[in-house]
Amino acid sequence: MGVKDKQRVEMIQFHQNYSYEDFILGYKPNANGGFELKHGVFYKFCKKALNTPDKDFFFIIDEINRGNLSKIFGELLMLIENNYRGKEIKLAYTDEPFTVPENLYIIGMMNTADRSLAMIDYALRRRFSFFEMNPGFLTDGFKNYMDTLSNERFNKIISGILEINEFICKDDSLGNGFCIGHSYFCNQKEFNLEWLEMLLNLNSATL
């Protein structure tokens, strides 16, 4: 922990048109007007992890519940289970054996506040551990950030946001997923009213 290696981290975002062919393997048009078999991003990353078994690899899927998960993962629903890691199966388009190595970790991120999105079905859900990520206003990192800005008005704004979030959590029609996140207020080197006005004007609809 604490060491970043971009070669061992891959991040993608699912969407409604994302497919097994994009993720694992499939035929794609080539320059000659024909089709050729091409490997998807997860396939390539698994091979990379397999070639370096002494290192951990992390595959991050943003908006995981935006895609058709059963269609995207296909037969890999079995291989991503702990009990089947390292075991081989044949993929849909080839007789080549394929495996998801034990040193590869899949992290899926989803927005539970967007009720227009599909929830993860049980077949895939039971293959993941679920953790709720709450706004980080009370973390040591954000507290240090507040100390760096050292502005009483900013501190009062954050206190107000915490009160609003408490109200949101208690509202049965909303809940934790609708809380205002800390990222709106980050990455500012010094506090000024111009920044605050821009923040509120640009993000008032989402807030």
Predicted feature locations:
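Short, hydrophobic/amphipathic alpha-helical patches that form generic packing surfaces
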Residues: H182, L202-L207
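The conserved phosphate-sensing helix
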Residues: L174-Y184
